[in-house]
């Protein structure tokens, strides 16, 4: 049985591995979303101010950058499942240590290492699911990122309940750490998939899956490097927009006097909730449409959503609509970009690592830029900056389509 090129019977035998990656991404979401709700508690533990402890976000992003570069190469050289299991254990260990650190310097080091572990799991999941499903990866990639959203959604709830029961954040972090252990056991019982590194050459008599392009004359290696650079830059712009919107919409609504603290918090939840819903909806969509069409629709949706917020900047209803639309629109950009890349080049751990270097750089830079401009120019600079970022992303997407045409459906 097949759905628009998706061979369901062939995919069924790969389900246990796919479940393992989905479980790992739930763990990744649990860890990633844990910092924000616990910042006040961590500030109390280290006897520092929020302005000082907010540097933990930068430390974790730096760890993500290093972990992306190192993790990608590691998956090309070592079996994937033991690597992913080891990094999940590393993450659990760091989560146990986080609430025990009395000094900000030590806590910063722990968050740096935690970021490296998170990046290794992120790179591994995105790489291994491609190696398992190859040219049919689209819906499974969207499913992977949906389960990251599930973990991100559950994390604040688990933290809130743990704090309610214990009165402190320590057990909140320990509960998140313990939840990762069953996921480690699941991965270790399954064989690792075969690397795609040797798939550059197609079998005799088979037409190459990877398309020719206007860059063909400069050689396949140079063409692939350019494509990797363009995709990494595109992901830099996308992640910068997503993290900036999710991180600043709360302060934006408060600063403009559109809402109080409670409604502003609900706005943030609405954005991440819409993003998770969008990733769920993207699973069937990926079986019917090609990645380039999905990405085009995503980018248009982002620009329309931001335009609604900017044109009716004094309307809370417009901000709600724009926030929900933005969450839905950005939801499938990352997994669809990886699916698009798989259609155009062999996906190795090293290639995926470079994609995450770009993504990590975006998560560090654009939110920081907005922070430097927010007070001096005003709250609306938030949406104007994200809009400019996404307009550049549209230009990079156009270059990708120009230099790497859509291959024929396999």
Residue ranges and their predicted role:
Residues 135, 143-195:
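Helix-loop-helix hairpin linking two adjacent transmembrane segments in secondary transporters
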Residues 289-337:
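C-terminal transmembrane helical hairpin of 12-TM major facilitator-type secondary transporters
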Residues 110-148:
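Cytoplasmic helix-loop-helix junction between adjacent transmembrane helices
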Residues 47, 79, 100-105, 134, ...:
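Helix-breaking motifs and short loop linkers at transmembrane-helix boundaries and internal kinks
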Residues 120-133, 331-345:
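Intracellular juxtamembrane helix-capping segments at the cytosolic ends
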Residues 66-105:
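Conserved MFS/SLC helix-loop-helix module at the cytosolic interface between two early adjacent transmembrane helices
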Residues 67-79, 278-291, 374-375:
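Helix-to-loop junctions at the C-terminal end of transmembrane segments
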Residues 35-36, 224-269, 273-277:
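Extracytoplasmic gate region of multi-pass secondary transporters
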């Amino acid at each position: 049985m097949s759905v628009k090129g998706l061979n369901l019977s062939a995919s069924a035998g790969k389900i246990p591995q796919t479940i393992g990656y989905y479980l790992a991404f739930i763990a990744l979401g649990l860890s990633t979303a844990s910092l924000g709700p616990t910042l006040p508690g961590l500030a109390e533990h280290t006897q520092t101010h929020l302005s000082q402890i907010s540097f933990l976000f930068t430390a974790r992003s730096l760890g993500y950058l290093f972990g992306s570069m190192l993790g990608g190469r590691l998956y090309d050289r070592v079996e994937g499942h033991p690597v992913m299991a080891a990094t999940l254990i590393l993450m659990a260990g760091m989560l146990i240590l986080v609430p025990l650190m009395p000094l900000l310097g030590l806590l910063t080091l722990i968050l740096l290492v935690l970021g490296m572990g998170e990046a290794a799991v992120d790179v591994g999941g995105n790489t291994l699911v491609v190696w398992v499903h190859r040219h049919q990866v689209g819906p499974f990639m969207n499913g992977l990122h949906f389960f990251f959203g599930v973990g991100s959604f559950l994390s604040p709830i688990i933290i809130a309940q743990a704090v309610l029961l214990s009165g402190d954040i320590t057990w909140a972090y320990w509960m998140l750490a313990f939840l990762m252990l069953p996921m480690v056991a699941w991965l270790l019982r399954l064989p690792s998939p075969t690397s795609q590194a040797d798939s550059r050459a197609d079998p005799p008599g088979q037409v190459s899956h990877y398309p020719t392009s206007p860059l063909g004359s400069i050689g396949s290696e140079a063409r692939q490097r350019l494509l990797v650079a363009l995709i990494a830059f595109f992901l830099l712009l996308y992640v910068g927009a997503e993290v900036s919107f999710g991180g600043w919409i709360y302060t934006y609504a408060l600063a403009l006097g559109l809402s109080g603290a409670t409604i502003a918090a609900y706005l943030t939840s609405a954005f991440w909730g819409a993003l998770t819903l969008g990733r769920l909806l993207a699973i069937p969509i990926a079986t019917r449409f090609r990645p380039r069409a999905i990405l085009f629709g995503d980018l248009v949706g982002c620009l329309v959503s931001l335009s609604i917020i900017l044109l009716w900047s004094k309307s809370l209803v417009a901000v709600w609509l724009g926030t929900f639309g933005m969450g839905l629109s950005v939801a499938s950009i990352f997994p669809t970009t990886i699916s698009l890349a798989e259609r155009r080049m062999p996906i190795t751990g090293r290639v995926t690592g470079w994609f995450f270097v770009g993504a990590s750089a975006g998560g560090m830079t654009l939110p920081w830029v907005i922070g430097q401009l927010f007070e001096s120019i005003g709250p609306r600079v938030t949406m104007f900056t994200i809009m400019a970022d996404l307009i550049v992303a549209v230009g990079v997407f156009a270059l990708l389509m120009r230099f790497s045409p859509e291959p024929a459906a396999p």
